[in-house]
Amino acid sequence: MRQITIRLADPSDAAALCDMHQDFMSYANTLQMPYTSRKFWEHRMSQGDQSATRLVAVIDAVVVGLLGINQNSNPRRRHVVNFGITVNKSYRGQGVGSALMQAMIDYCDNWLGIRRIELEVFANNPDGLALYEKFGFQREGIARDYAFRDGRYVDAILMSRINDQPK
């Protein structure tokens, strides 16, 4: 198995992220719109959003995955983050998602003092559900008609992981 390096994303990753999001499953299982341009990703990666942290997975100098962590700005919910993840189609099933998840959990638990990590996953994404459950996320409910995708409304499953031992 090749070594997976996790690091903070930077503006030079825009082209790789644009390419990764051209695959149907990369935008079908996220809230990204299809056909995003390189300019869109350059803008997104260069803006200094203080509430977002983006981690990338790299194999052999190629960006193969992205995980975005979004901290809640409401003072009463600063203990909460939400995240989204995408893995390049050529690298799925090779531990990239797990490496990104482990890095995110370590970052949230040991550096940010986050108590609750939450996410929404489309109900018809069994690979995503399995990955999140592998890392201790529990199902909390269903958001009916959560998003419009490929001509129809789809449900999402709400999940979270509670850190009972914040530092």
Regions found by a protein language model. Give the residues of each.
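Conserved GNAT acetyl-CoA-binding A-motif
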Residues: 109-120
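Conserved active-site alpha-helix within GNAT-family acetyltransferase domains
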Residues: 94, 98, 110, 123-141
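Acetyl-CoA-dependent GNAT
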Residues: 8-11, 24-90, 101-102, 107, ...
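Conserved beta-strand-loop-alpha-helix junction that forms the acyl-donor binding cleft
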Residues: 92, 119-129, 146-150
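A short beta-loop-alpha structural element at the N-terminal edge
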Residues: 4-19
